[in-house]
């Protein structure tokens, strides 16, 4: 069984380029430091996920991502719609700046971002003072874990540990919408 981490221990693990598991709004997630390309590739290898798909970033404050975003290209109405939905279970694909790492955007020109209202996710991001990768804690193509005890045992040896707590109780993973068009990409 993987080690249970305090928030402080989780921050240390993230700083060291490790991958952690933590509960999100609906399912358990895997996370790492989005600034460390090696950490992101480790996470993708654990999940057996293609790198071109792009990844979601979860944060407590949008300003942690200001260098990677080009919000000036959004209309005031679209930006207001995005900001009014946060914090909450809504992921938006925002226009990425040229500084956004390709290992996060994949083959896309946007950055998928959620400002979470989940107390543990928000506390982790605040303690970390940065966004973190948020992808479901499962091997690609397999169902995501809704409870800690449902985490795939094959993932556990590759994790620095688990930040324990309940999921937010949503029936489905968060919706994903394109902030530029308003189109729903995932319900």
UniProtKB/Swiss-Prot annotation:
GO terms for molecular function: ATP binding; double-stranded RNA binding; L-threonylcarbamoyladenylate synthase; tRNA binding. PROSITE patterns: YRDC. GO terms for cellular component: cytoplasm. PANTHER family: SUA5, THREONYLCARBAMOYL-AMP SYNTHASE. GO terms for biological process: regulation of translational fidelity; tRNA threonylcarbamoyladenosine modification. Keywords: ATP-binding, Cytoplasm, Nucleotide-binding, Nucleotidyltransferase, Transferase, tRNA processing. This is Threonylcarbamoyl-AMP synthase. Residues 4-187 form the YrdC-like domain. It catalyses: L-threonine + hydrogencarbonate + ATP = L-threonylcarbamoyladenylate + diphosphate + H2O. Belongs to the SUA5 family. TsaC subfamily. Its EC number is 2.7.7.87. It is found in: Cytoplasm. The keyword Nucleotide-binding applies. It is an enzyme of class 2 (transferase). Required for the formation of a threonylcarbamoyl group on adenosine at position 37 (t(6)A37) in tRNAs that read codons beginning with adenine. Catalyzes the conversion of L-threonine, HCO(3)(-)/CO(2) and ATP to give threonylcarbamoyl-AMP (TC-AMP) as the acyladenylate intermediate, with the release of diphosphate. It holds the Pfam family Sua5_yciO_yrdC. HAMAP family: TsaC. It comes from Xylella fastidiosa (strain Temecula1 / ATCC 700964). The keyword Phosphoprotein does not apply.
